[in-house]
């Protein structure tokens, strides 16, 4: 057998001398080794692979398996971004009382993963908040009202950028809506609404 490639079974690591079964990852198996973990029947398409254990499941048993783990998955909760359930013992990123899979939450600018320590969040312009890593935060435009980044629609007033909800009267704190009249206090360089003029 020298000089020849010996095919080994991915599961039992023994040489394959008869029928070869190849899965989607090009791994090779004995026919009797490539079976469903639950019912032990030979695997055929479609089949499912458990990412944690590497075990294979036929389509019928995958349905059973999901039904069995549903209460556990619901008790663990789901990611606020992709809405997929968390797995048991999975690392979870918690930010502002919302929970995410590690890797789901990314910087809006550079697309690198956001960690739990150094991030900035823009809450004003969209239902789904924009997040920014510390490095990119130094480069983006900031709202003059809240000093948060302005990645969505902004209001240009007094030569500065504002979130629409951040441009407020200095005296009464009412939001000054776009195209509404306002005056500027020359001493403090702050806006006042028409009511407080």
From Swiss-Prot:
The LIM zinc-binding domain, residue ranges: 7-68, 77-139, 141-197
Gene Ontology biological process: cortical actin cytoskeleton organization; filopodium assembly; phagocytosis; positive regulation of phagocytosis; response to imidacloprid
GO molecular function terms attached to this record: zinc ion binding
The protein's role, per its UniProt record: Involved in the regulation of phagocytosis. May repress ChLim and activate rab21.
Subunit architecture: Interacts with ChLim and rab21.
Gene Ontology CC terms, in alphabetical order: phagocytic cup
This protein's name: LIM domain-containing protein F
SMART domains referenced in this protein's UniProt entry, alphabetically: LIM
SUPFAM superfamilies xref list: Glucocorticoid receptor-like (DNA-binding domain)
Gene3D superfamilies: Cysteine Rich Protein
